[in-house]
Amino acid sequence: TWLRPGENRISFIEENGFHVVFGQRCCNKKGEDVCGDTFSFTNFGRKRAVMLLSDGMGTGKKANEDSRRLIETLEDLLEAGISEEFALEMIQDALLFQDKGAFSTIDAAVISLKTGILKLLKAGGMATFIRHKNSVERIMPAALPPGCRIGQQFDLKYKKLYDGDMVIMVSDGMLEFENMPEISFRMESLIGKIKTN
């Protein structure tokens, strides 16, 4: 519509209840030029923030190529308006069709900027930690990586986040040791010492 002289148009936009700050740290395995993990952080409009993490099978360049291709494909599907669940199912079917025998894990954390609800989708990834004000919550995966159609395709969990909470996603380089429960417990203890607002 056209405005007549002297008229003004005012638009009201609801402010989001939550804002997300991203941070990352990665390093290569000793002797490798590149890290086999790929990650991305994206705000999709004013509605949700999405964190993606993929760990390619093996190490180095090949693992990096596999995980990067998977993350880029998932980003393209989400940008096209496809839901996270359906996007993972499509990737699952595509990997099964290729049948190359190489599997990359997927961790997807989707945060509603309106409600603070965290939707966590995990396919073969490691534990995800939520640092609350007075506690640390550990979320363990059960589903296998995409391409392994045995049982569940991916885990789906919902969690409520509050002001100052932190969502910490890690790959097997942090937790894959002989004594997994002890390492995971130490990780929880370390995260618990992080100060939140």
Predicted segments, located by residue:
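Extended hydrophobic-aromatic, low-complexity segments
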Residues: 62-63, 119, 129-131, 137-140, ...
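N-terminal entry segment of metal-dependent catalytic domains or homologous docking segments
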Residues: 4-56, 62, 69
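Acidic loop->beta-strand submotif enriched in PP2C/PPM serine/threonine phosphatases
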Residues: 32-46, 106, 139-182
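Structural beta-strand/beta-sheet cores of well-ordered domains, especially the beta-sheet scaffolds
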Residues: 8, 18-20, 37-39, 47-49, ...
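PP2C/PPM family metal-dependent serine/threonine protein phosphatase catalytic domain
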Residues: 14-38, 92-96, 126-158
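Catalytic core of PPM/PP2C metal-dependent serine/threonine phosphatase domains
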Residues: 1-8, 64-133
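Flexible glycine-/small-residue-rich
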Residues: 14, 122, 170-171
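Active-site-proximal, acidic helix/loop segment immediately C-terminal to a metal-coordinating Asp/Glu
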Residues: 58-80, 161, 165-197
